[in-house]
From Swiss-Prot:
Comprised of three regions: a N-terminal protease-resistant globular head region, a short connecting subdomain, and a protease-sensitive tail region. The lineage of its organism: Eukaryota, Metazoa, Chordata, Craniata, Vertebrata. It is a peripheral membrane protein. GO terms for biological process: barbed-end actin filament capping; positive regulation of cytoskeleton organization; positive regulation of vasoconstriction; response to xenobiotic stimulus. There is a cross-link at K484 (Glycyl lysine isopeptide (Lys-Gly) (interchain with G-Cter in SUMO2)). It is linked to Cerebral palsy, spastic quadriplegic 3: A form of cerebral palsy, a group of non-progressive disorders of movement and/or posture resulting from defects in the developing central nervous system. CPSQ3 is an autosomal recessive neurodevelopmental disorder characterized by variable spasticity and cognitive impairment. Residues 589-602 have a biased composition (Low complexity). This is Gamma-adducin. Cleavage fragment 1-357 is abundantly expressed in the brain of patients with Alzheimer disease (AD), but hardly detectable in age-matched control individuals (at protein level).
């Protein structure tokens, strides 16, 4: 059989007509550097790269705008067809999967959506009638109703929780009568005014309980600072409210409550006298009110603060009931001094964050950190609270240069536009813009520090590098302390006429509309202060004791002579050669006249010789620097001074012939002798001072008069 099998094997090559099958190595060049790199790569690393490529494709599909638009259209269509159909839940799970992380930092469980009714059922509802922030407040209040139901504090829906959403109009939202706390959602809450009239019915046809709402309305009208009121009457709180001793400071929870007020409640607060008595009992700062033989009411400026006080008062009442039952009376209990321990308990708790705000960058309000933890619990159970978490739970990965990337202490918070339902896909698309806004609003300041560099061998290098560090000095922080503005009339003075405030506001708006440029508002404190102008740095005062000013050399000239002198100066500045030649000819004629007259020494008296000697000595003792500008002698100032002296000398004596020469720049000599002859060669001729033409005319006039 083996021989038959061996005979059946074909060992000849296939015929040439059979097509050649392409192999893997025929498509790859073994000398390709990319192929060599992949061949030398480890299998695990190659598998990781393949998984990254696959995830990249999925991410591109999920982040594509076309896929998002199609998914949003499908969700809107399913919501129009019916309430929570199966297709809508499936699409909602896909939307949650696309969102990489929910608000709390955890992904929502996919199978829990069908177990409970979601709290935030407003994405498809009409929210155009809601005021700013009402959508978020409705979600918070509905979540609080669910917490009260889970804690077992609900008493057949006879306990109520209300929240004021508008101080201007005093609008309050509350659950309607007949609706269980486990059914509370953001859409079925009823909005009423301060007197109980319905403003927004919500998604149900149920009415509110006016008797149960009356304590809430009385508290809101008495305390403008209160925003949330929680009223419960559980077994423990009702038992303590019937005790004459009230809430005893025997536990830490009772010390966290602060001052407690007590009021004899008769079942309603419709009468004006009862409201006045409640206002006297409640005071301006009390946060816990015990209704005698009825229950307990907790107040708060925020919903989180009110829950903080109602949780602690419920726990304190339970402790007190158990302690009295075990001890057999108040005398057997160790009662603490509240005033002694107030600084360690109530003051620390009232500062916010349960006492964890000490030097941290994240500032928590009273009860906020605990309330966020409970909201995360509800979200993980599938309640879909819609709560806007202030701080995420999961810590972000450290970035490059994270020592200066410190998150802002307080960021600007703005409510979203409630007129259009916000899709979770659009919310994720705006993540980058929100991250940018987060750092732009940071009030942190940094300082430049020079840090020595480290060399390769581990030693400290003399070179330094610049590092930015956060400024620890609180006085250098430019952001300041943020102030929460809840009331639009917060900065309006008390006892002001509202009509005047409205008129002033309208005037300011008109000024902004017409773009008027004014000096701004005038301060009432600085209006009567007279500010002296600072003295100028340069003060010019007349000094009577100082030396007299030099006389004006042109004071004795006429207007015609001044005009002629100005024209002469202009011709000199323009470089006209004719003017120079004319002046030289005038000087030559005057010098020749002087020479002809000085050649007869018998006509000069002895008195003139003495004057000549004095005049020559005075000129010889004076040094005149020679300045050359553009190749010419700039001797205008010297000429003016010499001309003055010559004119004075000519008026006091009968001297008519004076000759002044300059021999060298270092020394000026005047030679007044009859041997001076102007008939020498021009190259050896001594340079003479040229006198102005108006002086020559004066000399001619004097000669004629003489």
């Amino acid at each position: 059989m083996s021989s038959d099998a061996s005979q059946g094997v074909i060992t000849t090559p296939p015929p040439p007509s059979m097509p050649h099958k392409e192999r893997y190595f025929d498509r790859i060049n073994e000398n390709d550097p990319e192929y060599i790199r992949e061949r030398n790569m480890s299998p695990d690393l190659r598998q990781d790269f393949n998984m990254m490529e696959q995830r990249k494709r999925v991410t591109q599909i999920l982040q594509s705008p076309a896929f998002r638009e199609d998914l949003e259209c499908l969700i809107q269509e399913q919501m129009k067809k019916g309430h929570n159909p199966t297709g809508l839940l499936a699409l909602q799970q896909i939307a949650d999967y696309i969102m990489a992380n929910s608000f709390s930092g955890f992904s929502s469980p996919p199978l829990s959506l069908g177990m409970v009714t979601p709290i935030n059922d407003l994405p498809g509802a009409d929210t155009s009638s809601y005021v700013k922030g009402e959508k978020l407040t409705r979600c918070k209040l509905a979540s609080l109703y669910r917490l009260v139901d889970l804690f077992g504090w609900a008493h057949l829906a006879n306990t109520y929780i209300s929240v004021r959403i508008s101080k201007e109009q005093d609008h309050i939202i509350i659950i309607p009568r007949g609706l269980s706390f486990s059914e509370a959602t953001a859409s079925n809450l009823v909005k009423v005014n301060i007197i109980g009239e319905v403003v927004d019915q919500g998604s149900t046809n149920l009415k509110i309980d006016h008797t149960g709402f009356s304590p809430h309305a009385a508290i809101y009208s008495t305390r403008p600072d209160v925003k949330c009121v929680i009223h419960i009457h559980t077994l423990a709180t009702a038992a303590v409210s019937s005790m004459k001793c009230g809430i005893l400071p025997i536990s830490q929870e009772s010390l966290l409550l602060g001052d407690v007020a007590y009021y004899d409640y008769q079942g309603s607060l419709e009468e004006q006298e009862e409201r006045i008595q409640l206002q006297k009992v409640l005071g301006p700062s009390c946060k816990v009110l015990v209704l005698r033989n009825h229950g307990v009411v907790a107040l708060g400026e925020t919903l989180e603060e009110a829950f903080h006080y109602i949780f602690n008062v419920q726990l304190a009442c339970e402790i007190q009931v158990q302690a009295l039952a075990g001890a057999g009376g108040v005398d057997n209990l160790h009662v603490l001094d509240f005033q002694k321990y107030k600084a360690f308990t109530y003051t620390v708790a009232a500062s916010g964050g349960g006492g964890v705000n000490m030097g941290s960058h994240q500032k928590w309000k009273v009860g906020e950190i605990e309330f966020e933890g409970l909201m995360r619990t509800l979200d993980n159970l599938g309640y879909r609270t819609g709560y806007a978490y202030r701080h995420p739970l999961i810590r972000e990965k450290p970035r490059h240069k994270s020592d200066v990337e410190i998150p802002a202490t307080v960021t600007a918070f703005s409510f979203e536009d409630d007129t259009v339902p916000l899709s979770p896909l659009k919310y994720m698309a705006q993540r980058q813009q929100r991250e940018k806004t987060r750092w732009l609003n940071s009030p942190n300041t940094y300082m430049k520090v020079n840090v020595p560099e480290e060399s390769r061998n581990g030693e400290t290098s003399p070179r330094t590098k610049i590092t930015w560090m956060k400024a620890e000095d609180s006085s250098k922080v430019s952001g300041g302390t943020p102030i929460k503005i809840e009331d639009p009339n917060q900065f309006v003075p008390l006892n002001t006429n509202p009509n005047e405030v409205l008129e002033k506001r309208n005037k300011i708006r008109e000024q902004n509309r017409y773009d008027l440029k004014t000096a701004g508002p005038q301060s009432q404190l600085l209006a009567g202060i007279v500010v002296d102008k600072p003295p100028s740095t340069m003060q010019f005062e007349d000094d009577d004791h100082g030396p007299p000013a030099p006389p004006n050399p042109f004071s004795h000239l006429t207007e015609g002579e001044l005009e002629e002198y100005k024209r002469t100066i202009e011709r000199k500045q323009q470089g006209l050669e004719d003017a120079e030649q004319e002046l030289l000819s005038d000087d030559a004629s005057s010098v020749s006249q002087i020479q002809s007259q000085t050649q007869s020494p018998q006509n000069v008296p002895e008195k003139l010789e003495e004057n000549h000697e004095l005049f020559s000595k005075s000129f010889i003792s004076m040094e005149v620097p020679v300045m050359v500008v553009n190749g010419k002698d700039d001797m205008h100032d010297v000429e003016d001074e010499l001309a003055k002296r010559v004119s004075r000398l000519s008026t006091s004596t009968t001297i008519e012939n004076i000759e002044i020469t300059i021999k060298s720049p270092e020394k000026i000599e005047e030679v007044l002798s009859p041997e001076g002859s102007p008939s020498k060669s021009p190259s050896k001729k001594k340079k003479k001072f040229r006198t102005p033409s108006f002086l020559k005319k004066n000399k001619k006039k004097e000669k004629v008069e003489a």
